[in-house]
């Protein structure tokens, strides 16, 4: 479907500026003429809109006639909707909180912070059943220190 400039920006504003004034996901679908299943939209609205934004950022809208820009915006919304109409938001993981909890990715290594004061304190090394141990002052944990008694 093709749109003329007057369809989207009767006051002369470009399509992206016009879209920024919309707030509800349904408004985007209605404005761009994209049909949708309310059940899919209710389940994945934020994911669809975020993905549409990702697709729009990848497009170059500079110097495009409004009708052409509107057609591209419509295609971005249709593509984003299709992504979530056929699979769950967990599959696409568009939000950082879901991306960080992706079970298919290796967990980030845990970084342990040891304050300088901890390093400068004298250590408490003792022989515990033939194994040298050291007590951590900060966490009060006992850790093996096999080379400490040599």
Curated annotation (Swiss-Prot):
UniProt KW keywords: Nitrogen fixation, Plasmid
Regions annotated as coiled coil: none
Protein family according to the UniProt entry: Belongs to the NifW family.
Protein name as catalogued: Nitrogenase-stabilizing/protective protein NifW
Record function comment: May protect the nitrogenase Fe-Mo protein from oxidative damage.
Keyword Transcription: no
Superkingdom: Bacteria
GO BP, sorted A to Z: nitrogen fixation
Gene: nifW
Oligomeric form and interacting partners: Homotrimer; associates with NifD.
